[in-house]
Amino acid sequence: MKIKGKKLLLCMAAVMMMGGAKAQGTDAPVATMDLTLKEAISVALAENPTIKVAEKEIELKKIADSEAWQNLLPDASINMNLQHTILAAEMKLNDMTFKMGKDGVNTAVGAATLNMPLFAPAVYQTMKLTKQDVKLAQEKARSSKLDLVNQVTKAYYQTLLAQDSYNVMEQSYNISKQNFDVVNAKYGQGRVSEYDKISAEVQMRSLNSSLVSAKVGLSNAKLQLKVLMGVTANVDIKINDKLENYESSLVLANVESSESELQNNSALRQLDLNESLLNRSLKIQHTNFMPTIAFQLTGQYQSLYNDHWNVFDYSWSPSASFAIAVSIPLFKASNFTKIKSTKMQISQLQDTRLNTKRQLGMAVQSYKDNMASSIAQVNSNREAVKQADKAVTIASKRYEVGRGTILELNQSEVALTQAHLTYNQSIYNYLTSKADLDYTLGRENF
């Protein structure tokens, strides 16, 4: 997604938040953001500092790429020198003394120099190296985005799980409270024993404690999601979604895995690019055995033996020259050890890539197995919820007519609560395994 599109989405979200802003006791504005998974990912990609750092790193590599080819451009400089001779040197030859200049005079020289490389193999290879470095920075930025999308996706599903768990516990608590009210009323009429009243009250208070814990878990899940999105603490997020809505999208994972599946994995791509960089570095080191050719053009004005300091009144004489310099390396021991070291690094990188690919292949297979297992669990747990709900209805009727006990009623309610939680957990397990699989395979779901 383009950055402009992200910013537009963020502005729309800000308008929505301001529309729902309230003022509490401290007059701190509290905004509410209606959130979907797609919106959460878009906001995170636009605002997360890690992504911004990765994008700036790409710009730095592009600047380095520009610096590389600029080494082929001419280099021009101007130098000026004003020298005052206090005492000129003397030369003696066969008892004769010759003065090498004059005492107390000024010599002025102004020179312009132009240097330009004609053949610089190291520069050519460095230019190719920096282009590979830009690609590596882009792949690292892509890896950061994939990692962030994976974290946001799982945090979103974690929030859904916490939200659904809270709703289940709230529903169970309300049912237990209704049962306690009924049992307490019957106890007041002398129709049930005190044991039934105590059991119903214990059940209600136990579920109330679980409800409080579920509420804390929901708050923590939302906080984690907001941190990943880069959303401030005074913004509340509202998710009109639940895990049950994703049941229809559960697809049995393909058990077979192919070699091409991992071609988009960012870790393998980075290893390949690093190997390319090492190969390019090896070629740069080989250029240490090649000659270099440079062109130099020099022009200068000089004025000699001036007895005053007014340079504008000097008598200047021009001169110019050019030179072609050829440098041929003959021997440098460190060049050979550098090449040997780089070849060893390439070999290490190849072994690392092979091991990484094997581990990723096992991870992919594990995620697929978990997805297949979760689908089977979802199908089983769905039926368990239906049966547990039916059992609660039967236990309630039996207790109302005096054929059942409070223990049966409590057990049926606990079984229903557990069935709902297990059902939601199995869907969550599938979705998180699917998110990890997408991340491992380098799927860009953004």
At which residue positions do the language-model features occur?
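Small/polar, glycine/serine/threonine/aspartate-rich low-complexity segments that form flexible
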Residues: G25-M33, N79-M116, K242-L250, K283, ...
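Residue-level detector of the transmembrane beta-barrel scaffold of outer-membrane proteins
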Residues: D75-N79, T113, T126, Q270, ...
